[in-house]
């Protein structure tokens, strides 16, 4: 596990590829800034979910990376994966639209009924 100012978990294959980046001054400065924000404000996702995507999927198994533009800003919404929410929460409109587009492209309904995208 790679540790910055925060205790985050990153899968070994990503850690090897990102280690050099983590040592650069800009990243250390950014890490310190984020750490301070967590100390004084409500920040999402919870610290344990920072870099979650890099822990759930090894580098060599990654085929697509989706970056979110507008992060979720409410309690229990952000879980470290773009557009995903905990399975007990209702599907956000953005994720509903993504599922509709996938269904349209594939021509068949999806079996996904929750916003948990970790599977």
Predicted regions and their residues:
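A polyanion-binding, active-site-adjacent surface
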Residues: 20-119
């Amino acid at each position: 596990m790679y540790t910055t100012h925060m205790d985050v978990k990153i899968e070994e294959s990503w850690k090897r590829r990102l280690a050099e980046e983590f040592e650069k001054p800009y990243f250390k400065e950014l890490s310190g800034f984020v750490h301070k924000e967590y100390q004084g404000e409500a920040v999402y996702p919870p610290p344990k979910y920072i870099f979650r995507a890099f822990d759930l999927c090894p580098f060599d198994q990654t085929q697509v990376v989706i970056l979110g533009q507008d992060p979720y800003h409410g309690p229990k919404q952000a879980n470290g994966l773009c557009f995903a929410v905990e399975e007990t929460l209702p599907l956000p409109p953005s994720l509903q639209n993504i599922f509709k587009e996938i269904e349209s492209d594939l021509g068949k309904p999806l079996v996904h009924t929750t916003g948990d995208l970790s599977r």
